Amino acid sequence: MATACIAQSTLQVHGISKPIVARFDQPHASSDGGALLLKAVDERLGLTWRLASALRDRRQPGKVAHPLRDLLRQRVFGLACGYADCNDAARLAHDPIHKLLLDRDPLAGAALGSQPTLSRFENAVGRADLYRLGTALVDTVLSSHRARLGEGARLITIDLDATDDPTHGQQEFAFFNGYYDTWCYLPLLATVTFNTEPIQHVVAGLLRPGTGASTRGVRGLLRRLFTKLRTLFPRARLRVRADAGFADSKLLSFLDRAGVEYVLGLPGNRRLDKRVRRLLGRARMQARTTGETATLYGETRYAARRWDRTRRIIMKAEVLCYPGRARKDNPRFLVTNLPHRPATVYTRLYCGRGDMENRLKELQQGLAMDRTSCSRFLANQLRLLFSVAAYVLFQTLQSVGRASVLGAAQVWTVRERLVKIAVWVERSVRRIVLHLPQAFPWRDAWCALAQTLAGP
């Protein structure tokens, strides 16, 4: 009969008279007791079920030990719990909570998939599978908001942003990017915001090679988003926001033909600098008079050489004043088809786009969006979709608990407070009992969320 080796440590702590003995001797315990909230969210959305349904299993049925849905859920829930590597599978193989997340018996159920199994799964996915996965992800998110809002959506804002994903191996399509001064990928992220709500809901993630136009893949992504949004929310106005890296002639013409609102950053040039010169002079005078930063707004009509028409340009003439430093000019430009006053367009309708940086930070630092270390490009795209799917679970959980102090918290805070809970699992014939710490500081918030998710 095999016996498990029990790890034990003895500590002598100053001020405590007795030695402290720490034993890792609880086989039916886990440190991820709160992850059941994420499973409840997944059941409400049907997210992993839809994603798994988009995959085609080409394996011989009689030899399959781990269904694709289980492997997909193992990766998504693992990322959500902070386990970014496939190598973590060996450490979690017998974790009772992670078995429970896959609908297995937490004590006697089969072990989770191994690292080689997960790696084969990631590298077996093809282009068609990824397209269906991306479509299923968008459909799941938008359908949930259709059920939540009904006909109440009047404005839907689509935010686009990209970032660098440094690579450190021989990954496919990882190229040197001079702007970021590194070998990298350039993942693109898209979010939707409904009406004046503060949450930017992530709906798509697209991995792109390390070089090329910043608008690569944008029109195809937007075309599919426009179609789905107009089907689900026929009365809503669509608005696109993005920084200056996306303001090229083809994308602007595409947005005009699509009949959507847009407000995009625009890089400065000599012609625009001449247009803003007078406004900037007034801002300099105001800054000299008050000794504080001065900001003025104006507008003009402008067409770059490759544009097919003139467009409205919002100009911000700003002079920055900091104690002990020389004053600094900071002119900025936007291109838009919105009719609002220049100051309103810039401060109220465009600046909210900057919160996309937080979405990127959460995905990179909290959900390992940049863990793209597979040799195959398509496998890395799959990993990106897994991170986005895990983020959708967290965003939905935060939407449910918006009234609590956790509603606006970032991913790692929610994970530390709601997911990382020590638990002892007990199973009887009739039920499974999770024994959680009585002194858990976020007990009330956890119970409130669990009760809400258990409701109709």
Which stretches of residues belong to each language-model region?
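Short amphipathic alpha-helical "interface-anchor" segments enriched in bulky aromatics
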Residues: 41, 345-382, 386, 390-397
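Short, conserved catalytic/metal-binding motifs centered on acidic residues
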Residues: 41, 74-75, 86-89, 114, ...
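Dynamic "connector" segments at or just before major functional cores
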Residues: 1-213, 217-232, 398, 405, ...
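Flexible loop/turn segments at secondary-structure boundaries
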Residues: 98-99, 165-167, 211-212, 246-250, ...
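A glycine-rich phosphate-binding loop feature that marks nucleotide/adenosyl-phosphate handling sites
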Residues: 365-368, 378-381, 403-419, 437
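Domain-level cores of phosphate- or acyl-group-handling catalytic modules
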Residues: 212-271
